[in-house]
Design a protein with these regions (language model features):
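TPR alpha-solenoid repeat register
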Residues: 498, 531-532, 566, 600, ...
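TPR-adjacent "capping" and linker segments in tetratricopeptide-repeat scaffold/adaptor proteins
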Residues: 1-8, 15-16, 100-120, 136-143, ...
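Alpha-solenoid helical-repeat scaffolds
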Residues: 369-560
């Protein structure tokens, strides 16, 4: 059985249980059991199957069983539990990294619970001794604490059903004043990964204990992990009512709810990272690379004199950037996105995850702290810059922890003479970021909490996207997420402002289906609002569902606001449905509100052309040209309408102006000008224009002949004999 087949059966089992289709779930389970070749599960499967058959028998033979619901619940959870076990057994055969790490841990901890407990106790004692040495300024220079922490991380992560000694370890770490906060963060991350690896209610409850503790830097990670778990296991939570009370208690705290909402929004934002990276690399970087020769010349970068100050800002930068249309706005937009928490550095740092530091899985989740011994060991003791860099990185709220380590480790291999410049630039950048923040924001403690959540989600994103063995993990950033369909959201988080925030997020990022769903949800929960009808209509329009969009625009129209915008959109939708009469009606309605809008007049004229009312279209375009005489976009339809209406001399004059203009001509400019010359019996000139038309396209004959056939009726109307058109085609083909 392939990896995909195992995953399909396992996921299908969970779906069947959620839908109440337990027989189908049992059949899936039987296939997994057969593949596992583990007979010790056979008895459990037979018991579940018999219990379910008996329950159905009693139910449909008329027996009243007050325990039916409880038995059904027990069978469902048992099916899922067995599916978890079989899935882990089968998956391990296909996952070499997890398999090797499990074997390594067994060699360290063994399998005897007493031995494992003893090793855990030893770890906790070492933490206390290490803290004591730090308090008395005694340094061992030993790597053992970090290695021990890596082992504890993997022990928690690879644990399936949590045991008493695991629970004791996690709680003692949470409560201990001797375990540093970065290591507590690692335990939280290991616990989160462990839940994704194997569902266990006790693990979820342990995460909530870290949240209740409210230790700065730690609880935000636990909260984020908990929310990702709730998203991932939403359909399964209903089978575990023991979670409801603890979660309700937890999210009664308004501050915590606000932080949870931020984490949800940041999670949605992180799913945009690939798009942001692609946009930056395709739209901004190429333009900046093209600018480099001009920057070097204009700023005389090769002539740095002794008197130059590296901190002086050169006004030429802004001038050069302005030379590239739209570049400054793009850079400004990406800077704003960065300040708002968007992940704009993924592409930059993705190639800097190859340091040995990132070999242990735990280090992908390690918070950046400037006292980390790993950092100091990477630099010579006499290096004057690294402490300034570490201090700056620790304060840099806009860079995630994983990227901070990449930055610092890469800095260590940069030539010493360049380090000063980089540190100075980095400190200036950090200072500028602080300047963007208001005084109130700097004093707002919630911002610190927010930055922890944002950075942690970006750390998680890097792990799931860049870790060498990432394919052995379920990527929590993949798959469809619709809060409207999630029971945990309805139970613990549902409130109108957040629904609106999620809807706006999807709308702004052009996720039309999700936006439509969330605005529909908002509509169900609130009073009728014109802006909701408008946004739903616009989403439907962008999805190509024009008739539905019209229905919603008409409902928005009843509120008597934004009439110009609504009429314009209705006209556009009717155009797409090719109902040009209705389109004209709405565009004219909009024109009454904004009579001087040339765009509206152009749309009305376009509808007249589509309705073959060329005289009406020509009148409008002629009026528009009076105000914009040099606009070829207006002259083109004027020339074509004149040709169709038989005003050949005027059409010839118009096409002569179009072809003389330095603006790039289209295939149709040459073709239509050729039509006019042909009808005026200027055949040689006409064929030259037709040749230029053919030369302007990649695959010449099909689109050219198709357009020629469409226009043949106007050629016939203007005196060309029907037999002449096929001769014209053959003549042109001989020319190439």
């Amino acid at each position: 059985m392939t990896l995909k087949e195992i995953q399909r059966l396992y996921q299908g089992t969970g779906d069947f249980v959620a839908e109440g289709r337990l027989l189908d779930a049992l059949q899936n389970l039987k296939k997994l059991l057969k593949e596992s070749a583990r007979p010790e599960f056979s008895f459990d499967w037979e018991t579940l199957n018999d219990n379910y058959r008996t329950l159905l028998k009693y139910a449909f033979e008329g027996y009243e069983d007050p325990q039916q619901k409880a038995i059904l619940h027990s069978i469902s959870t048992s099916i899922l539990g067995m599916a978890d076990n079989l899935n882990n057994i089968l998956m391990l055969r296909h996952l070499p990294f997890k398999r090797s790490e499990k074997a390594r841990l067994t060699s360290i901890f063994g399998e005897d619970p007493m031995v494992i407990s003893s090793r855990i106790e030893e770890f906790l004692l070492n933490q206390e001794l290490e803290q004591l040495m730090e308090d008395t300024e005694i340094s061992t220079g030993d790597d053992a604490p970090a290695e021990n922490m890596d082992n504890i991380f993997e022990l928690i992560w690879l644990t399936e059903r949590i045991r008493e000694y695991h629970t004791d370890l996690v709680r003692r770490v949470n409560d201990s004043p001797h375990v540093e906060w970065p290591r507590k963060c690692l335990v939280v991350s290991a616990l989160t990964l462990s839940i994704f690896n194997y569902f266990d209610v006790q693990k979820i409850l342990l995460l909530t204990e870290f949240i209740h503790k409210r230790e700065q830097g730690v609880y935000q990670r636990a909260l984020t992990g908990l929310l990702l778990v709730l998203i991932h296991y939403d359909r399964r939570l209903a089978l575990h009512p023991e979670l409801e009370v603890p979660l309700r208690e937890l999210f009664r705290d308004e501050t915590l709810r606000a932080e949870a909402e931020l984490a949800f929004m940041q999670f949605l934002s992180a799913r945009e990272t690939e798009h942001i990276t692609r946009e930056f690399e395709q739209e901004v970087l190429p333009e900046m690379k093209k600018m480099m020769p001009r920057i070097e010349d204009k700023l005389q970068l090769g002539d740095i004199t002794e008197g130059s100050d590296p901190d002086d800002k050169n006004p030429g930068w802004k001038e050069i950037i302005d030379d590239v249309p739209g570049l400054f706005e793009k850079i400004e937009r990406f800077s704003r996105m960065q300040m708002e928490g968007s992940d704009v550095f993924m592409g930059t740092f993705s190639m800097l995850k190859r340091f040995d530091f990132f070999n242990p899985i735990a280090n992908w989740f390690l918070p950046f702290y400037k006292e980390n011994p790993v950092l100091f060991r990477s630099f010579p003791k006499d290096d004057p810059y690294h402490e300034r860099l570490f201090d700056g990185l620790e304060k840099a709220f806009y860079i995630c922890n994983s990227d901070k380590y990449s930055f610092a480790l890469n800095f260590a291999i940069i030539p010493a003479q360049q380090r000063s410049m980089i540190v100075s630039y980095f400190e200036a950048e950090l200072s500028q970021m602080k300047d963007f923040a208001t005084e109130e924001q700097l004093l707002d403690q919630s911002l610190t909490s927010n930055s922890v959540i944002i950075q942690y989600i970006q750390d998680l994103y890097r792990f799931f996207k860049l870790f060498p063995s990432r394919h052995e993990f379920n990527d929590v950033f993949q798959g469809r997420v619709n809060f409207r369909e999630m029971e945990f959201y309805k139970t613990y988080f549902e409130r109108l402002p957040f629904i609106e925030k999620v809807a706006a997020f999807h709308f702004d990022r052009q996720h039309w289906e999700e936006a439509l769903s969330m605005f529909g949800y908002l509509q169900e929960k609130s009073e009728p609002r014109t802006d909701i009808y408008q946004k739903k209509a616009y989403a439907l329009q962008m999805m190509g569902r024009y008739q539905d969009a019209i229905s919603h625009y008409r409902k928005a129209e009843l509120f008597d606001t934004d009439q110009l915008w609504i009429a314009n959109k209705l006209g556009w939708c009717y155009m797409k449905l090719e109902d040009y009469g209705e389109a004209i009606r709405y565009f004219e309605q909009a024109l009454k509100i904004s009579p001087d809008d040339p765009r509206l007049q152009g749309q009305i004229a376009q509808c007249h052309i589509q309705n073959h009312d060329y005289e009406a279209a020509l009148q409008i375009y002629t009026r528009l040209r009076f105000f914009m005489p040099s606009n070829l976009r207006i002259l083109r339809p004027i020339a074509y309408c004149m040709f169709v209406l038989g005003k050949l001399t005027e059409a010839e004059e118009a096409y002569d102006i179009i072809l003389a203009d330095p603006e790039k001509k289209t295939m149709y400019d040459y073709m239509n000008a050729g039509h006019v010359k042909l009808c005026l019996d200027k055949r040689k000139h006409a064929t030259e224009l037709y040749k230029l038309s053919v030369m302007g396209i990649d695959s010449p004959w099909t689109p050219f002949f198709h357009a020629l056939d469409e226009d043949s009726k106007w050629l016939l109307k203007n005196g060309i004999h029907p037999d002449e058109i096929p001769l014209l085609k053959d003549f042109l083909m001989y020319q190439f």
